[in-house]
A protein has these predicted regions:
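A structural motif detector for beta-strand N-caps
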Residues: 135, 139-143, 147-149, 155, ...
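Terminal amphipathic alpha-helical/low-complexity segments used for targeting or macromolecular assembly
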Residues: 1-132
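Conserved phosphate/pyrophosphate-binding and hydrolysis machinery centered on Walker-type P-loop NTPases
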Residues: 123, 150-151
Length: 165
């Protein structure tokens, strides 16, 4: 059976520049901030923009019952308000996992957003997060939409690896 290489696809120059700038910004922020609290705030703010199209801020209105679903949505974008499956496991290392949880939540929520369906952006986004989550991630790694993992801190992914769901 013949082996066919992946085709090289690109967004528009404007799209590529914007996507690259966003990923570089996130990479810089996650490199600067290792504390779970700060990473959670960064993730919350970015998800707020991705899902709701506006910056995080303002007070939630807890008095109006009609506002409750929107409050639930806003609060659910913050990784501190989410529990992930690995947190229930007895073999979890809480010290290693705590700074990674916001990034794992970001990965999962990115993949569930319309933006996460963009493969060009997604490959680069997941590789960037992988540098902060995994024990090691090689060069030219492509991780497709929908791939999930439990901890991340014990994973090594070598160069030129492609992972599908």
């Amino acid at each position: 059976m013949p082996r066919y290489p992946y085709r090289e696809l690109k967004p528009t120059p404007e799209g590529e520049a914007t996507y690259t700038r966003w990923i570089t910004h996130l990479d810089t922020e996650f490199t600067r901030h290792h504390k779970p609290e700060l990473r959670s705030e960064i993730v919350r703010d970015e998800l707020h923009q991705l899902y709701l199209g506006r910056p995080h801020g303002g007070k939630l209105n807890f008095n109006m019952v009609t506002e409750l679903p929107f409050n639930v949505l806003q609060l659910s974008l913050d990784p501190r308000n989410a529990t992930l499956e690995p947190e229930y496991y007895g073999d979890l290392n809480p010290e290693k996992y705590a700074p990674l949880k916001p990034l794992i939540w970001f990965w999962q929520m990115f993949d569930r957003s319309p933006v996460g369906l963009n493969h060009w952006l997604g490959f680069r986004f997941r590789a960037m997060l992988g540098r902060h989550i995994f024990k090691h991630i090689g060069k030219n790694v492509k991780i497709f939409h929908g791939v999930e993992f439990s901890y991340g801190y014990n994973l090594t992914i070598e160069d030129n690896c492609t992972i599908h769901k």
